């Protein structure tokens, strides 16, 4: 418990005959007794001076956190004018007056009503005054005094963070800085050791230590390995009172993580790996994966794989999967089981990031042996060449062998192979192949001038397994032979003037040859022997593949000979020599003195257009036939006369229209016959439905001839009654009223002709008197009457 003692504070009046106020206060034991005298004049202060009717006091000290049941006594105000008769009244104002601090207005005793906390407010400034109770006037000037709250150790140290997080590299040296923790104490640092904090470690030894005054945490153990332990939890205590017994304390937690360094080399879990790869594996295809283990993480665990040696150094490669840190073994070149079926490689795994500080731990790499077994697969035949080029002369006979392709089964079984030509590449079937030995031969004649290159594809397939096949292109070049005679470069037709002179050039000739000539074409020109002696012209070979035609005589007469045909023989210089005879047409024309053509005969005028005589005759015949056809067609059209629509103004025509009237249903196959109505005697039997077999057959009876004056309605009612009594069919037919067009015609309706009278007393001869318009009707009914009579 806390004990309290008294100390005296005196306030003196500085002049005689003046009253003075004495302020008394208690003091706590343990503090030396002190006495201060302050002289205040009015509201101002001056140390060790006197002033009329002034307050004299010292500052008060009050302990915080008072726990007693009574009010805590602070001090006492007293004036020398107070005679104890209750005439004076003491008033207190300022910080906490009336709330935290109260004063007995009669005695001047000051008390604290609540627990005070220095950490909330360390100093209170109050004002005191004594007044006359009766008049209310102050008997002393108002002055201030101070109450200071004395601190006690009632606050424990508080860390700035509840939890600290820190990290350091593994394998750090002893004394490596980790983190600094800080704790604060709310007590008065200037009073005693209440706010003096000392740090200590409660948990985390022997790995870490803390400096007692600064709170700096350092490593205390050498070579802490993250792979053994990564997380550490350290508890730090902060205690006030300089760490002495009885001081208050607080704790915090520090989570320390060891970060990784590259202190572990990669290691293969096994020294030898076995893989199998079919020989059909395409290049750049993976065949397996290997992985070296590294206890480090992140970039310190990154590994680069490489093939260092082995007989498959050029056949295989290895790459690193950056996500899984695995080595992917791939095929670089095509494998061949028959050539080599086992490869042995040495693979090395190396860290890409190496810390020089830990090189003493050994080389940061490891190696392993890889055995790759190549598996045999059924492969297609392989040709001896990737492509074949064959040259053949165009005059080679049919069925001649021009070349051979060869393919073999690369497998150990050496299956036999058959050959064929892909007909999509040889649609004309110019070539064929021996399926057994691959000999290619011609099946048709070749012509270099038609097609120089033939590109075909030959297929080689295993006989036992035709699906195993391969293809090879065969390029066949047709070589030229001299099988084409030279010919004129164009059609030559020229003219000669009647007044031409001898040895005059009238035309220059040139020739072409479809064949190739390795030494160049050399053509020779001459007049055919049979025409050389009688020719009116001469031919001069220019020795440059051209020739000139010259006149042999002076003057030509077109009336005697209008056209000359000059046969020219053209020969080449290749072997065998080819020659041809071409004809030059020469027209005789009239010319002026300068040699310009004025006129020729009709044929000569036509021919320059480029058309032959036969072509002109064919064109003329076509024109004549076309003209004759047009004339005949026009004549026939004019002879055809169209019947007039109306003969006269009184010509009135009625059209007989045929109507298909429904009413009997779809199964009623017996159509309504208007002819029967006109000729009642034609009704000679009873018509039954064709699609229904009647249950009771009855003999058809002959319908009686209609009586005189029987109209169409009576006849229809009779037929309707017969159909209604048919026991084998429902009543499909019903009475229908038929309307006939033609009302208003002078001849009235056709039905009236039949219904007015019977056949017995009706005479249709009067129809002939109605004119040509009723001739057809009169013929119809007139012939009917004649039939009756017969």
Curated annotation (Swiss-Prot):
Glycan-carrying positions: 165, 255, 437, 455, 536
Compartments in which it is found: Cell membrane
Topological domains, Extracellular: 54-615
Domain called Cadherin: residue spans: 54-159, 160-268, 269-383, 384-486, 487-608
Gene Ontology BP terms: adherens junction organization; calcium-dependent cell-cell adhesion via plasma membrane cell adhesion molecules; cell migration; cell morphogenesis; cell-cell adhesion mediated by cadherin; cell-cell junction assembly; homophilic cell adhesion via plasma membrane adhesion molecules; Notch signaling pathway
Proregion positions: 31-53
SMART domains for this protein: CA (SM00112)
Positions of region (Disordered): 261-289
Record key words, sorted: Calcium, Cell adhesion, Cell membrane, Cleavage on pair of basic residues, Glycoprotein, Membrane, Metal-binding, Repeat, Signal, Transmembrane, Transmembrane helix
Domain of life: Eukaryota
Function: Cadherins are calcium-dependent cell adhesion proteins. They preferentially interact with themselves in a homophilic manner in connecting cells; cadherins may thus contribute to the sorting of heterogeneous cell types.
Name used for this protein in its record: Cadherin-6
Originating organism: Gallus gallus
